[in-house]
Every structure is written in structure tokens, then in C-alpha cells.
Amino acid sequence: MIFWLMPIIVAVFWAGMNSLAQYQSAQNAPPTTQTAAQSQAASFVGYRNAVGSYVAANPAFTGSVPTSSLAPWLAPGQSLPNGAGNQVAATPSGDGRIIYSWAQTFPLQGANPGVTNAAAQLTGGDASIGLVAGTQWVSPIYGVQALTVPAFVPDGDILSVVQTGS
């Protein structure tokens, strides 16, 4: 009489073990593209903020801020994004600065708008962040902008353009 319960017990046991195996494999899965995009976005935003802090502390500076000069403004242990670069130019009046900060969106081929979207989300919709598409700057919030991207910024990179002063 108890023998008719045995197949049910085995089936329930097998289903439970299968569910447990699937759960564990999901917990040990490698980072997804979304997680990688968020990580790259956080790295870029930290870099961009460090460049801006350097310029705020050195308002007459123009040129490219050396990586070694950014250490006081980077979070402890923060790594720089791949292909990170910056350029600080004087505004036409000379009273302000235009700060360009950029980085590769992925070490793979092609641009990844996921990094740009994640950076915009991380900064609460900061309109200074966009993606370089040829000579155009594309905001994840506002689309194609009238800003012509300088030739020194590589195509496909994430780009932040901030003006200080006038």
C-alpha cells in the first residue's frame, strides 16, 4: 500500500533538487551586461567628477589633467575607466572652462549605450553625459544635441561636457 506513494515522493524530491540546482547556478552566474554597464558607468562618473574637482581647485588650468593629479579626488581603490581621457579648454571669454571627460564604453567593439544610460541614471539624469556618434553628441535623455564633438574624443566613447563660468 505504501508503494504507490514512492513515485510521488521521488518526483517531489527530484523537482526540489532541480529547483535548488537552478537557484544556485543563477546565484553563481557571471556578471551580466547590465551589471558591467553599471560598473563602467560608476567608474566613468567617478573619473568625470575627479576631473571637475581638479578644475574647481585649479580654475586657471587648461590642458589635460594628468591621472596622477586626480588621486585626491578619486575614491579609495577606484580604478580608472578604460580609455579615460580629458581636456580642459578656456571659454571664449576666458573667464570659464569647458571640461571634456571621456572613456570607452566597452572594451569590446562598438559603442554601448547601456553605459551611457546607466551613467545618466546614476547621476539623476545629468544632461552633461552623452555618447559620441561620429561628430555628434547623443544624450540618453535628449537625443542628438547641437554640440559638435571635438576630434580628440574617440567615436563610440561616453562623453561628459561641462562648462564652468562664462
Model-predicted segments: where are they?
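N-terminal alpha-helical signal peptides/signal-anchor transmembrane segments
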Residues: 37-61
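Extracellular/periplasmic head regions of type IV pilus-like filament subunits
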Residues: 56-123
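N-terminal signal-anchor/signal peptide hydrophobic helix marking the start
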Residues: 1-12
